Amino acid sequence: MKTTRYFREQVLRKRPYIQLEWCEKILAEPAAKMVQADGRIRFWGFVPELGWRALRVVTLADGETVHKAFPDRDFKPPTERVS
């Protein structure tokens, strides 16, 4: 897994509990995914070790270089609409 310098030097320093394995799993099997206006991609997944809280992993536009990761307390799983 590729990471940015910002992720290695800032994110992991601020949130040392974040495991790279969690990020890899979320990228491989996201619960949800969204492309931001700037081209970066948000991936969400649920982490048992965080009490099944949602973890947001943001990658660069390539979809594989991790730039940010943090617990996302505002994440709402997508709901299906019935027409």
Where on the chain are the PLM-derived regions?
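Ribonuclease/tRNase effector modules and their secretory precursors
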Residues: 1-83
